Regions:
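Short amphipathic alpha-helices and their capping loops
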Residues: 22-27, 306, 402-403, 409, ...
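Motif- and composition-driven signal specific to adenylation
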Residues: 77, 83-91, 97-116, 158-358, ...
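AMP-dependent adenylate-forming
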Residues: 1-14, 23-24, 123-164, 194, ...
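AMP-binding/adenylate-forming domain of the ANL superfamily
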Residues: 1-174, 189, 196, 294, ...
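Regions immediately C-terminal to embedded phosphopantetheine-bearing carrier domains
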Residues: 71, 171, 528-639
């Protein structure tokens, strides 16, 4: 119980300290007693106070208990970003359960694998994802429409919730990431690991009047920082509606809700620094991460928002969102951004190949210790034992997570990222195991083998390329073959893991030792135009779009009738085109139009106000519906 005398103090002076033994729901309940009428969540026109959040999640927790949910039981969340999603999340914890975020945009095979491994007793859905849930054969738990049940509970008497003893060491969620074995792996995170990243911290200072933006998909661990950073500190969580995403819309939501803190993936942050305009008077701290930071964009952002603090944050899912952070000073002039120093309740050391601690100034594998470490890889003791090991450090033996990242520790404790030991890459904040893509491709009956590489296109843009060796010789000259393979791959892997380019080969080059010579597999050029194509723009709109596409794709002479995505374009590149288009035209452009009209000629006609014939319009609408699924992978995008 909270001391009444404690409640009489000025709520602005109350600071909830980190206690590694407390559960998340206990801390949120304390916040609801400190300031019951403070706004907990904003979602469009909806607002929920801390008292309302506490009471609604209590009622839903009772409902879950009636369905048999108890301590340690898994509950799935096949939901978008929404106010109800946060209520469901908190109610699961109050019932003693463990939540598993499931992205409705993921392919059926991915969802089926996760469902079969976790076997959730209950799965929350909304009206849009209910049909999706019914199509996943291994999703056998009780299906609950979150909106319907919460709507009913809103007008019902609150039943008394039976107290479930949950401590900081108990699991709170299981989040699935890309796995090198060809299957996603579940990372089990404890309550204390979540609390530790947002309470009593050295890289960030939460205030009660802060508004934290929630723009990540719930299956991305940045959500952990957004939701629990707000609720455990008595702040307001501003949930960005899960609709068509654009930089202008992102900035608009931030401005309208008075966002003061946000996290952006590195790629999205770079676009934000390049294109986001307008006044954001309450914005005081932006964090970015998920890929190597760009000093140029950091400086550009600080010039545009000189009063805003900017931090480059680093951390694998296995260490709960962040493990290190670097605050970029206004006068930063270096050519590389470090990933910073260890955040509070976290340890960092650099190890050699024998897992011995190295002194500052030596490169080695980055290992992380502290309260942020995951409990395990769900139902995978061998993998857990491989990545979570005891290391003899100067401070004594510590349980550490081996990141696979190569880094260098400076004498002052600052860490610089130097590369990877394996074939894992990060694109738009998403961790991608290239081996997982290769495994999926090698299961395709039309292929005898496949190699997947990540190439740099320009100074920073990463491009996943699949090199395909078909079984049938006729496929070598079949232009439809790569598209057919990628179509089958989309039924297996999330959109963000689908290669943006393919190369069909009759054989792979070999080293003298007889192994595939991956270094000899060069990136294909961006195929901009067919030899017989009319690539010359004839209108102002076509000229402008050709320039924007060339800048985004790194190609010249683009065919006016080639689909943006067929040219290897990604959703992040499309956002770049959209932002540039709005900036050049000086007016808003519906981002959906770029999906619906995905060639230069079609989009130019749309911009000029010219109509398409009915058949082409229907085809464009159908194509847009498929291609817009990629936007759901953004986080602060979403992505």
């Amino acid at each position: 119980m909270t001391d009444p005398a404690f409640l009489e103090t000025n709520e602005a002076d109350v600071v909830v300290s980190y206690d590694r033994d407390r559960s998340l729901q206990d801390i949120v309940r304390q916040q609801s007693r400190i300031a019951p009428q403070a706004t907990a969540i904003v979602f469009g026109d909806e607002r929920l106070t801390y008292d309302e959040l506490d009471r609604l999640s209590d009622a839903l927790a009772v409902h879950l208990a009636e369905l048999g949910i108890g301590k340690g039981d898994v509950v799935g969340m096949l939901l978008p970003r929404a106010l109800n999603t946060v209520i469901c999340m908190l109610s699961i914890l109050k019932a003693g359960g463990v939540y598993v975020p499931l992205d409705p945009a993921y392919p059926e095979e991915h969802l089926a694998y996760v469902a079969a491994e976790c076997a959730p007793k209950v799965v929350f859905v909304d009206a849009a994802s209910a049909l999706r849930a019914s199509s996943v054969p291994d999703l056998r738990g009780t299906i609950i429409d979150a909106g319907v049940v919460i709507g009913r509970l809103t007008h019902s008497a609150v039943a008394k919730r039976r107290a479930i003893e949950v401590t900081g060491s108990d699991p709170a969620y299981i989040m699935y990431t890309s796995g090198s074995t060809g299957r996603p792996k579940g990372v089990t995170i404890a309550h204390r690991s979540i609390a530790r990243v947002v309470l009593d911290q050295n890289y960030i200072d939460f205030r009660r009047d802060d508004v934290i933006l929630h723009a990540a998909t719930i299956a991305f661990d940045a959500t952990t920082f957004e939701i629990w950073g707000a609720l455990l500190n008595g702040c307001t969580l501003a949930v960005m509606p899960d609709a068509d995403f654009s930089l202008a819309r992102l900035a608009g939501v931030m401005r309208d809700t008075g966002v003061s803190m946000t996290f952006l993936t590195t790629g999205l942050f770079n676009l934000f620094a390049d294109y986001a305009g307008g006044d954001l008077p309450r914005l005081r701290h932006v964090l970015f991460g998920g890929d190597v930071g760009s000093p140029v964009h950091a400086r550009r952002f600080l010039q545009r928002y000189p009063g805003c603090r900017l931090s480059n944050a680093y951390g694998p899912t296995e260490t709960t969102v962040f493990a290190a952070a670097f605050t970029v000073p206004p006068d930063f002039a270096e050519t590389e951004l470090p990933i910073g120093k260890a955040i509070a309740h976290t340890g960092i050391c650099i190890l050699d190949e024998e897992l011995r601690e190295l002194p500052p100034g030596r490169e080695g594998q980055l290992a992380i210790s502290g309260d942020g470490l995951a409990i395990d890889y769900f139902r995978s003791p061998e993998r857990t034992a491989e990545k979570f090991v005891m290391v003899a450090t100067e401070a004594g033996p510590k349980r550490c997570y081996l990141t696979g990242d190569i880094a260098l520790l400076q004498p002052d404790g600052t860490v610089s990222f130097k590369g990877r030991r394996d074939r894992q890459v990060k694109i738009n904040g998403k961790r991608i195991e290239l081996d997982e893509i290769e495994t999926a491709l090698r299961n395709d009956p039309a292929l005898s083998d496949a190699i997947v590489l990540c190439h740099l296109q320009g100074p920073a843009l990463k491009r996943i390329v699949a090199y395909l060796r078909p079984r049938a010789e006729t496929a070598l000259s079949d232009p439809a073959f790569p598209q057919e393979v990628m179509s089958r791959l989309r039924a297996t892997l999330p959109v963000y893991m689908i290669p943006s380019a393919t190369v069909v080969v009759d054989a792979f080059p070999l080293t003298p030792a007889g192994k595939v010579d991956r270094a000899s597999l060069l990136p294909p050029p961006v195929e901009a135009a067919r030899p017989d194509a009319e690539a010359v723009a004839s209108t102002q709109a076509e000229t402008l779009l050709t320039q924007l596409w060339s800048e985004a794709l790194g190609a010249e002479g683009i065919d006016l009738d080639r689909n943006f995505f067929d040219l290897g374009g990604t959703s992040l590149q499309l956002l770049q085109v959209h932002a540039g288009l709005e900036a050049r035209l000086g007016r808003a452009v519906d981002v959906v139009a770029l999906f619906k009209h995905s060639t230069i000629r079609e989009l130019a006609r749309h911009i000029e106000g010219k109509s398409q014939n009915t058949a082409r319009s229907i085809a464009a609408t159908q194509r847009a519906a498929l291609q817009r699924k990629t936007m759901s992978q953004f986080r602060r995008s979403a992505s």
